Amino acid sequence: MTVKTTVSSKDIDEAYLQLKDIVKETPLQKDHYLSQKYDCKVYLKREDLQWVRSFKLRGAYNAIIALDEADRQNGITCASAGNHAQGVAYTASKLNLNAVIFMPVTTPLQKINQVKFFGGDNTEVVLTGDTFDDCLKEALVYTEENKMNFIDPFNNIYTIAGQGTLAKEILEQSKDNDIQFDYLFAAIGGGGLISGVGTYFKTHSPETSIIGVEPAGAASMYTSVVLENQLVTLPDIDKFVDGASVARVGQITFDISKDIVDDYIQVHEGAVCSTILDMYSKQAIIAEPAGALSIAALDQYQAEIKGKTVVCVVSGGNNDINRMKEIEERSLLFEEMKHYFILNFPQRPGALREFVNEVLGPKDDITKFEYLKKSSQNTGTVIIGIQLNNHKDLGHLKANVDEFDKSNIYINENKMLYSLLI
């Protein structure tokens, strides 16, 4: 028996019929703020408004319903950093199936709780491993030992076809309003979304350029397709964009992406954070890091999209409110607005006032001041955080700090110190 390893637009049409009464047809909205900002027409496909607040329900349900009834009754498993897990849990509850869901221990608490909420009594959550890839190994061993069915988050043709149904929605919604897209931007984690959406667009809207967007610290598809021309595993990844931080993409998604993705963009995690804050403050859109990737990529394509029509897939909105402080911190660091130093600071009254007057600009602010070590001498070791009013003042700030203490250490340029102290 030949195992099918690719996906066609017909497969996506069939998945669409399967999912029609299960998933929500999410809005395709023109974004006036982004359109004005980039001097083009920007539309957002709002998968953050899906039942489980991400597109992953589409692929999960389609892959599970494709199993034989007997296989489904044996139970299902999955490995996921959150959104695929919610899709599997939702489906397990809907179809009254037993599900065991493996999630990395680094998964935001909000996503873990949502999986339990959607799955109810049908779902057991197992936290294991620091990354998705570590978690995946455990899930596969458990699945084989217990003769259950593993629902792959991306390397599965039914998962990919399910994700592709949002492309069918986009094109039907745009046809109703006579819209033709020049560019489509979508996030890449394991590659299921870009493979499904890209496949459908290449068949029904071949003039649209497909742009895949990855976190700079986890660009596994770009590395595999563009740099190495073979499937590779990244030795280390930045896990912050948890919904798209995958060390190794799927063989199926790799093969499809090679043919249908026109360009790959890597976005710095700090830029993702700035986009999250911008979308929330300007438009009250709550995007998770992976959900903000497609919009964050527009900065790098500003010249190309000017005067064009663009659609960005907002792939998810499962953002843990407890992460907002970290998101703001990463954004300020990326925008070069926040800076940390270790200084020898005078231990006498009035020293801090002198520092403010001599080192800071009139609108700069001290956000952190902490003695690392006090001594009986005239000075103590201090860590100080400074937020600038204008990032262009950094050179002036550094010069003033050097004059205050020539032996100072600039922590922003030392990742090890930053991770230990901030």
From Swiss-Prot:
Its EC number is 4.3.1.19. Residues 339-413 form the ACT-like domain. Pathway: Amino-acid biosynthesis; L-isoleucine biosynthesis; 2-oxobutanoate from L-threonine: step 1/1. GO terms for biological process: isoleucine biosynthetic process; L-serine catabolic process; threonine catabolic process; threonine metabolic process. It catalyses: L-threonine = 2-oxobutanoate + NH4(+). Pfam families: PALP, Thr_dehydrat_C. Its cofactor is pyridoxal 5'-phosphate. Keywords: Amino-acid biosynthesis, Branched-chain amino acid biosynthesis, Isoleucine biosynthesis, Lyase, Pyridoxal phosphate. The modification N6-(pyridoxal phosphate)lysine is found at residue 56. Disulfide bonds: none annotated. Catalyzes the anaerobic formation of alpha-ketobutyrate and ammonia from threonine in a two-step reaction. The first step involved a dehydration of threonine and a production of enamine intermediates (aminocrotonate), which tautomerizes to its imine form (iminobutyrate). Both intermediates are unstable and short-lived. The second step is the nonenzymatic hydrolysis of the enamine/imine intermediates to form 2-ketobutyrate and free ammonia. In the low water environment of the cell, the second step is accelerated by RidA. Homotetramer. Belongs to the serine/threonine dehydratase family. This is L-threonine dehydratase biosynthetic IlvA. The gene is ilvA.
